[in-house]
Amino acid sequence: MATPAGLERWVQDELHSVLGLSERHVAQFLIGTAQRCTSAEEFVQRLRDTDTLDLSGPARDFALRLWNKVPRKAVVEKPARAAEREARALLEKNRSYRLLEDSEESSEETVSRAGSSLQKKRKKRKHLRKKREEEEEEEEEEASEKGKKKTGGSKQQTEKPESEDEWERTERERLQDLEERDAFAERVRQRDKDRTRNVLERSDKKAYEEAQKRLKMAEEDRKAMVPELRKKSRREYLAKREREKLEDLEAELADEEFLFGDVELSRHERQELKYKRRVRDLAREYRAAGEQEKLEATNRYHMPKETRGQPARAVDLVEEESGAPGEEQRRWEEARLGAASLKFGARDAASQEPKYQLVLEEEETIEFVRATQLQGNEEPSAPPTSTQAQQKESIQAVRRSLPVFPFREELLAAIANHQVLIIEGETGSGKTTQIPQYLFEEGYTNKGMKIACTQPRRVAAMSVAARVAREMGVKLGNEVGYSIRFEDCTSERTVLRYMTDGMLLREFLSEPDLASYSVVMVDEAHERTLHTDILFGLIKDVARFRPELKVLVASATMDTARFSTFFDDAPVFRIPGRRFPVDIFYTKAPEADYLEACVVSVLQIHVTQPPGDILVFLTGQEEIEAACEMLQDRCRRLGSKIRELLVLPIYANLPSDMQARIFQPTPPGARKVVVATNIAETSLTIEGIIYVLDPGFCKQKSYNPRTGMESLTVTPCSKASANQRAGRAGRVAAGKCFRLYTAWAYQHELEETTVPEIQRTSLGNVVLLLKSLGIHDLMHFDFLDPPPYETLLLALEQLYALGALNHLGELTTSGRKMAELPVDPMLSKMILASEKYSCSEEILTVAAMLSVNNSIFYRPKDKVVHADNARVNFFLPGGDHLVLLNVYTQWAESGYSSQWCYENFVQFRSMRRARDVREQLEGLLERVEVGLSSCQGDYIRVRKAITAGYFYHTARLTRSGYRTVKQQQTVFIHPNSSLFEQQPRWLLYHELVLTTKEFMRQVLEIESSWLLEVAPHYYKAKELEDPHAKKMPKKIGKTREELG
């Protein structure tokens, strides 16, 4: 018998001679199939069913020889089965014996006497055999009844065969899991169908019942409100009538004094006139007394209302969102200081210094060199301020002024004539806001259909939806809405849906053919985000299946030819965007600190350049906040020496109302500087921008599949991004772009385009989503740029380890449930495992807090010690996950107070977002059939549930520090962790990031035995042994004689 390695080499050699090719996985497949077959003909038939081999001639001989060479396990019969088989044979043998008939009584007596003793001896054995036979018959009847129930009365037996090997058992479990998965998917679809209200089907009985119920509730509420409304209306009427009567009385007295002032009146007329004057005076005194009482009431102390025993409610102080926590205290201090400071009036204006002067020293300025000019298509004109433009033009005039408006009819004709259309237009041409409106006006939303427009960023989806709703004159959330992760601002009437590309991907789960959409517009396609690339492949297939679906791919002036080729040579429709020329300036020498150079350049432009707003591109939230603080500090020190400079940040985690400030008109006499991430390159259009500052850097996420480590590093941007940034300056007038790097660096150090995100990120969520959609052949999926093989393989391995995929790569029931949760697969597994450990409420809180991207605590520079002490007060034994749970629990107990957040140095906006995430995840628990339960303070169960999801991320303490269990990579605990000084032996981490070191963030102390409990398929007991914990045997020393 050949060895496995030798057999595999033999199969590869034979495959090469028979088929002309050889591959290791094919050889292993053939050997495994031959081992599972019981005969050579069955093996040949299985190969023929695959439709990959022509089993005639040499191929058939090869299959027969392979079957004869493959070793097979001999079926070993269990002792209990052997004893049972012998008992059955003996029973059949006894039944074959018959007594012979004889007329002689003596012979009968002899036989009876001789056999009496033998019958007594065998009596017990016969009774035992009879009992065993009855039990076997009962077991066979029960097995047949179960088989009839499962197969609907068919003759197929569900009894496990005697010779069932490991492969057959695994196959049976796989088929059973597939049935459960399909049943779960059907239940989810049925629930969605029951909860979906179809406004077009007026005959729906359930809809009628719901409408009647709502009308009845409204009627009851109206009846309950009528008495109070009558009282309120009566009071308002009496007050109004009092004013009218008093005015009539005063007018009547004035007329009488004017007409009969010099006429002798009778005694009755004099008394009547005196009475009217008395009434008028009393009415005036009554009104004055009422006003005086109101004035005193405002300065009077009022006893607070009793609130004990009432449930705490969520309070959102919208008026305090405009700044950091403690904004109200800061405003009060500024008001008091302002009242105490000395101010000059017009009388002292002559004695003051000139209003403006040069505030930068010559050595502080940055020298720029004008290199090129981006040509525009309109003549320069005097740029009107935003306030003047808003006063002179209406919204419709602004729409008509956009570059896309002259091409409206041609664009609609091209959309009608082609199913897929590539639209090329620079940011600001109006393609994002106007094209969906044109389609709406053209009737593409008739018959209940909708139009989807995807955006790569949630900030862009929210701001664009608000702008379109304002232009259409509708309320946001009605006809126009947006849908982003953990926030849905749509309704049943929404026909224009702006959403992130990830949200449209999730809609494929419930509606794989996008039947409710007539047009799908993929905007900002040139950014090539992960979800955008996946959408390309899916929408391409859906478009072939639905000829009536219109697909629009909107991009800037990059990669349009490539998009056209991908979509089967789709036509390209070009829209001009830049309307004015842009001068580009480079520095003479490289800048060492580009953040400091940005601040200096902003002040230099503000002092030396004509009016016009400034746009600064930085890499992330930390740099933006630092730059804004530096600018505000320097402007505060300069005081009245410079004009007013409004510093406005814009990044993804900023609240919506603060994001909307960048779109507000700049006040007269001031200048606005917008400090933004690369979101302002293409996703947003800010009016009034004349100057652009480009340091030439951006943040990119990279992923190492070998270590599973992600890193968000600052890297030079591409030439395409630099050109996009420069184009922001030519929207309203001739602009200028100041690049804080040299022209040589632009030509030789910048890449042409940015690497697509799909080639530098983890693919766990994408693989799970595609598997949920029934796409199993991921290697041949129609990617615009295929991801690296190692990254895809690692994603499959992780999903298999989490139980989302079986050994054949098919989606399991757990995987189908995990796909319903809009979080990372490990986080989804943790939530599903919480049901087993009865701690789903605590796990939901932990999952929500982990989803806010490490932005819970903040450390003001002037209160670092206080912030660190406040953070330490939340520490609990066990790890950072329990710290996050403690923070949220105390915040909830405080009534979701913003003041509590300020006192404990916790970011209120992040906590409010965590609350929104938790509410959505709690609503999805019913969808994935997980019940709500609490551990009642037993945090061991919480830690075990977290381990069930993140057992892939474990590390243990060795003599050289922490190392990951599987990869043996050296890692470090983050200094902000609660376990930084404790150094436990076994750790679990949420993510591994590369900054200055390989840091583990959000670590949790675990026990090694838990890994065997939650993931016995992934860890072996030998891997979890501590080699340093073993004690070596004591050695007995030798004497001098023994040593020789």
Swiss-Prot record:
Gene name of this polypeptide: DHX16
Matching InterPro entries: DEAD-box_helicase_OB_fold, DEAD/DEAH_box_helicase_dom, DNA/RNA_helicase_DEAH_CS, HA2_WH, Helicase-assoc_dom, Helicase_ATP-bd, Helicase_C-like, P-loop_NTPase
Cited PROSITE patterns: DEAH_ATP_HELICASE (PS00690), HELICASE_ATP_BIND_1 (PS51192), HELICASE_CTER (PS51194)
Bias type Basic and acidic residues, positions: 169-210
Domain Helicase C-terminal, chain residue ranges per copy: 601-774
Gene Ontology MF annotations: ATP binding; ATP hydrolysis activity; helicase activity; RNA binding; RNA helicase activity
List of residues that carry Phosphoserine: S103, S106, S107, S163
Ranges for domain Helicase ATP-binding: 412-576
Pfam short name (any one): HA2_C
One Gene Ontology cellular component annotation held by this UniProt entry: U2-type precatalytic spliceosome
Residues where Phosphothreonine is found: T715
Organism listed in the record: Pan troglodytes (Chimpanzee)
Full protein name: Pre-mRNA-splicing factor ATP-dependent RNA helicase DHX16
EC number: 3.6.4.13
Compartments (UniProt record): Nucleus; Nucleus, Nucleoplasm; Cytoplasm
Residues annotated to bind ATP: G425, E426, T427, G428, S429, G430, K431, T432
A single GO BP: innate immune response
Catalytic activity: ATP + H2O = ADP + phosphate + H(+)
Annotated region described as Disordered, given as residue ranges: 101-210, 374-394
Sequence motif DEAH box, residues: 523-526
Gene3D superfamilies: 1.20.120.1080, P-loop containing nucleotide triphosphate hydrolases
Basic residues bias locations: 119-130
